[in-house]
């Protein structure tokens, strides 16, 4: 096992270093072509050669701008982070395969904690200008990426892992990983690809709606990461083990259970993101040049994107069910089809909503619609692959959770309106209350209604909560 892991890691290092080298070369040439005397003051011959190759008109064209030049320099500095994050992901997969989930999950906390420390403490002391502080943050990204990977090494060491070079060339394990990795990446990156395509289309209409939509995507990624991706990460090795032993009844039961937990968490999260979109955006972003108009635009984008939360998360779960069965091509094909549908939906809806000045809403709905088709096609293909899915018991629970989420969402919306009517939202504490108080009450009502309806997921949550309370009392 460890020899195969070492071969994969060695291949990853070779590939990442090759890509990093090419990017370094490309960025250096771009910067040198625009300012050969500045970049090669010690080599005037190189500057003259570059001028002969590119021509003086290109060198004096004014491209790239100062902002683009800063971006290129930061990219050149930060691009080695790609190697760090790839190693961290490989280490996480190795630990997951050995049944360890907490340590790799905390790796992201290590990364974000170091970035926050860099912004708050290191960057202000690095220089007074914004460029110097941005440079400090770029260095912090590299350090945090290395720490995220190194943080997981002690756990791997205890499992018996020791790295040594194993040539990846003509290695059968590396060949299989590469063969399955490319379609696998396209399969699980459906949400990111759809967002990228939608933003590219929206730029041709109005660049401001792209900024509004980007804020909505960032807010969506929090519950999607907490509930969807974390559950999918845990699920893959479990399903893979059941598939390897050909325990397909247990495979279907585990998948059904995971989808039930996903619906339990994501339906209420979707409802709250929809009805509390404006208070949430106001609390997090409304300050400085981000005014009330900006809040309304971003909130509308979030409200249109929020119904797709459970769909985006379900794509991650279902795609990993295929991967556990050794099939990486089907999710890739379905993702490609839905990417094409997303382009059609985006062109149609962005232009339609842009006539009312709300093109960001069209972006959200387009992504939600393509995700719905993605989930439906994945379910259809998986049912054919497994003969049946045994989801009959989940349907009753799903509609009960959907009804409870709608009820809780309506009450949260009314509660937020009443709170703002009495408390306003000019200061931080009223803004915080307009989000947290309705959210807490809605979650409580949602859970109590599902307990009353005897939904299994709510009952299991109650049992888990009681066990934790008993442990604390002891």
Regions found by a protein language model. Name each.
Residues 1-474:
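Membrane-embedded alpha-helical bundles of multi-pass transporters/translocases
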């Amino acid at each position: 096992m460890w020899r195969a892991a070492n071969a994969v890691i060695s291949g990853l290092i070779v590939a990442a270093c090759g890509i990093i080298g090419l990017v370094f070369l490309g960025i250096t040439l771009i910067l040198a072509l625009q300012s050969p005397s500045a970049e090669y003051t010690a080599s005037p011959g190189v500057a003259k050669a570059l001028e002969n190759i590119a021509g003086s008109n290109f060198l004096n064209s004014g491209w790239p701008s100062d902002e683009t030049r800063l971006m290129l320099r930061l990219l050149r500095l930060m691009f080695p982070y790609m190697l760090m994050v790839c190693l961290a992901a490989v280490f996480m997969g190795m630990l997951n395969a050995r049944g360890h989930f907490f340590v790799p999950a905390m790796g992201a906390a290590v990364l974000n904690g170091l970035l926050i420390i860099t912004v708050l403490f290191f960057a202000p002391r690095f220089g007074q200008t914004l460029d110097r502080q941005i440079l400090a943050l770029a260095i912090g990204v590299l350090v945090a990426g290395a720490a995220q990977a190194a943080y997981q090494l002690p756990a791997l060491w205890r499992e018996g892992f020791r790295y040594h070079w194993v040539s990846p060339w003509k290695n059968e394990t590396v060949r299989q990983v590469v063969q399955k990795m490319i379609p696998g990446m396209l399969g699980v990156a459906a949400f990111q690809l759809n967002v990228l395509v939608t933003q590219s289309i929206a730029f041709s209409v109005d660049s401001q709606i792209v900024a509004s939509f980007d804020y909505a995507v960032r807010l969506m990624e929090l519950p999607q990461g907490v509930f969807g991706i974390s559950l999918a990460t845990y699920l893959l090795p479990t399903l893979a083990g059941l598939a390897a032993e050909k325990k397909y009844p247990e495979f279907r039961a585990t998948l059904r259970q995971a989808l039930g937990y996903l619906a339990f968490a994501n339906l209420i999260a979707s409802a709250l993101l929809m009805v509390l979109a404006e208070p949430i955006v106001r609390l997090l972003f409304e300050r400085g040049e981000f005014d009330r108009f900006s809040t309304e635009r971003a909130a509308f984008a979030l409200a249109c994107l929020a119904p797709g939360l459970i769909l985006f998360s379900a794509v991650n779960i279902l795609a990993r069910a295929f991967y556990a069965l050794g099939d990486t091509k089907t999710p890739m094909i379905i993702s490609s089809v839905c990417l094409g549908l997303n382009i059609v939906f985006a062109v149609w809806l962005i232009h339609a909503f842009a006539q009312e000045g709300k093109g960001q809403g069209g972006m959200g709905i387009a992504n939600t619609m393509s995700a719905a088709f993605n989930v439906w096609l994945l379910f259809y293909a998986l049912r054919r692959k497994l003969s049946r899915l045994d989801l009959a018991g989940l349907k009753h629970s799903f509609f009960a959770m959907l009804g409870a989420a709608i009820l809780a969402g309506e009450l949260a919306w009314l509660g937020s309106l009443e709170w703002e009517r009495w408390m306003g939202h000019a200061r931080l504490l009223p803004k915080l209350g307009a989000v947290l108080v309705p959210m807490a009450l809605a979650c409580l009502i949602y859970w109590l209604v599902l307990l009353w309806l005897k939904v299994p997921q709510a009952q299991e949550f109650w049992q888990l909560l009681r066990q934790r309370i008993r442990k604390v009392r002891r």
